[in-house]
Curated annotation (Swiss-Prot):
Its cofactor is Zn(2+). GO terms for biological process: chaperone cofactor-dependent protein refolding; DNA replication; protein refolding; response to heat. A zinc finger (CR-type) spans 135-213. It comes from the Bacteria. This is Chaperone protein DnaJ. Homodimer. It comes from Rhodopseudomonas palustris (strain HaA2). Keywords: Chaperone, Cytoplasm, DNA replication, Metal-binding, Repeat, Stress response, Zinc, Zinc-finger. GO terms for cellular component: cytoplasm. The keyword Zinc applies.
Length: 379
């Protein structure tokens, strides 16, 4: 009986004053949630889905909605002139349009040729920091699927052709009626290709593709960083049955370097210097990324951790004329395995040292003295 039916507005979870846009939005949301394909094996979902569609079919139509608002479900019972909510071809079209949008099926209509784009491929390549600095052209070999030459990618034996699928008429999809609504599904006979290959090509067993080793040249520009991706258009898997090929993506990683650490376009290195050089000052040579050398001047009294900037000796910036800098951090080495004479000289040096020659140490021990002195005076 009509009295047992749930209110259409409640079914769509909208107010009675809802406009067309609100109705459509509510329908999309609920249809997505309760669609049978998203709830396989759940009979209650199918019932709920039918209720949602019935409610939307009535409320989206101005005349039917007016009749429903006045008479309720009785408006569509026999004797009221409605003959039921009237789910016909118009509903199937509306339903199909909405679900093509929801499930991404719009582009699959009439595909009929069975052509599919080839898959994209990934290739991981490790390069050196020097390669990233100078740039290079590398040769790589990769196994890829290419179009079968025996059948020209059709998948059919030479001298034969694929036949149009009789089940779907070449569309690749079939419509299935379920009660008052229609669902569009992949054709079970041709698996969506739209064609049937009765006599497959022996070289590719009907796939239209074979695997071969391919040698490719990869141009690595200056300034690439760890994780840089290079795209080679059309060098991926061959398309299925004449479809376009996919792309090949080269993912670069930089090997660790024995001397330099990279930070964007800047390079960093750590160089040990002698205690004498640090105390008296001097200079030392450091290597550069272009396999040259440059001199660094060290002022007297240099401490461990001090950094020196060498402008323009870093990495080039990708697709730019800019170049980073190199930063050299010094580490003052404490001498080991001293001779007796060296020990005596250092001991003599220590006796002659004062706060002026070791300001940081003098300042620290002064603070220590003050600290213990203040504790001694505390009652």
């Amino acid at each position: 009986m009509s009295t047992t039916k749930r209110c259409y507005y409640e079914t769509l979870e909208v107010e009675r004053s809802a406009d067309e846009s609100t109705l459509k939005s509510a329908f999309r949301k609920l249809a997505m949630k309760w669609h049978p394909d998203r709830n396989p094996g759940d009979a209650s979902s199918e019932i709920k889905f039918k209720e949602i569609n019935e409610a939307y079919e009535v409320l989206k139509d101005g005349d039917k909605r007016a009749a429903y608002d006045r008479y309720g479900h009785a408006a569509f019972e026999q004797g009221m002139g409605g003959g039921g909510p009237g789910f016909g071809a118009g509903f199937a079209s509306s339903f199909s349009d909405i679900f093509e949008d929801l499930f991404g099926m719009a582009g699959q209509r009439g595909r009929g040729t069975g052509r599919e784009r080839g898959a994209d491929l990934r290739y991981n390549m490790e390069i050196t920091l020097e390669d990233a600095y100078k740039g290079k052209t590398a040769q790589i070999e990769i196994p890829v699927s290419v179009t079968c030459e025996s059948c020209s990618g059709t998948g059919a034996k030479a001298g034969t052709k694929p036949k149009t699928c009789s089940t779907c008429g070449g569309a690749g999809r079939v419509r299935q009626a379920q009660g008052f609504f229609t669902l569009e599904r992949t054709c079970p006979s041709c698996q969506g290709r739209g064609q049937i290959i009765e006599d497959p090509c022996p070289s590719c067993t009907g796939s239209g593709r074979v695997t071969k080793e391919r040698t490719l040249s990869v141009n690595i520009p200056q300034g690439v960083e760890d994780g840089t991706r290079i795209r080679l258009a059309g060098e991926g898997e061959a398309g299925v049955r004449g479809g376009p090929p996919g792309d090949l993506y080269i993912f670069l990683s930089l090997a660790s370097h024995a001397i330099f650490q990279r930070d964007g376009a800047d390079l960093h290195c750590r160089v040990p210097i002698s205690m004498v050089t640090a105390a008296l000052g001097g200079e030392f040579e450091v290597p550069t990324i272009e396999r040259g050398k440059t001199k660094v001047k060290v002022p007297s009294g240099t401490q461990t951790g001090r950094r020196f900037r060498i402008a323009g000796k870093g990495m080039p910036v990708l697709r730019s004329r800019q170049v980073g800098d190199m930063y050299v951090q010094v580490a003052v080495e404490t001498p080991q395995n001293l001779t007796k004479k060296q020990q005596e000289l250092l001991a003599e040096f220590e006796k002659l040292s004062s706060g002026a020659t070791q300001p940081e140490a003098a300042g620290f021990f002064s603070k220590v003295k003050d600290f213990f002195g203040s504790r001694a005076n505390t009652p």
